[in-house]
Each structure stands twice: as C-alpha cells, then as structure tokens.
Amino acid sequence: MQRRHFVAGLAAAGTLLATPAFADLPSLRFRDMYSRGKDLSEEAIALQGQRIVMTGYMAPPLKPEINFFVLTKTPMATCPFCDDATDWPNDIVLSYFEGDMKFTRFSNLIRVEGTFDTGIETDGPTGFVSKVRLLDTRYTIL
C-alpha cells in the first residue's frame, strides 16, 4: 500500500467517525409539522415517540437553570413564551435535555436530535405550555 493511499484512508475514516450518529434518523422540517393551521400533519403524528432530527435555532433560555430550550425556525433574540396552547406558534419546538447543556448563540444554526412528543403539556417549574416537544435532546452546531 502506498503511503498517500494510507493517509487518504485515514482521513476518510476520520470523516466517517465525525459524522453525527443521528444522520440516519428521520427528519422533520418545521414546514411539514402542521397540515392546516394548528393541526399536526400526518407526517408529524407518524413520528410520535420516535427519535428524529430537526434543524433550526436555539432561542435564548428563559432562565439559566432550566432543562429545556426552544428550537425555532428562525433566529430569535428573545425566547417566545406561551402561557396558553392556543398561542402556540407553529414554528417552535420545546426541547428537553438531561443533565447540563451548554446553550449556544441564538444565531447559530443547529441540528437537534430528540424523541418527538406531542400533546398539550405544561412545564411545572416555568409554566411554559407546549404542544410539541423533543425529549432527551442533543445538538450540534452546523
């Protein structure tokens, strides 16, 4: 084996190892989440309980000690806070994480992996009402 082929093979292997593990998961785009108004699409309903990937932006956290962030379709300098499910925007997803997570700048495009969950729920400590969520979330900056 020639040295340059060996080095090229090492570089290719490193690229494969650096590829996120969630590359093979189903993805859901914000525009495909709802069919009409505030009704979830068939695609979104079919993904209930599955690990999925979404791409968007992390809105600034409500408080530094919370265990979730809001994934948004477009960058937002302030966090959208909803106190009623009827006000739930169709371009945000509440994203819960376990343990500590480093928040990123609101203008960084991120790819998020989590278990897709639907239904109206209220976060006890904050009172934040959500219609869709990602559970056990992790992200990478794109």
Question: Where does each model-flagged region fall?
Answer:
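N-terminal export signals
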Residues: 5-23
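OB-fold and OB-like single-stranded nucleic-acid-recognition modules
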Residues: 22-142
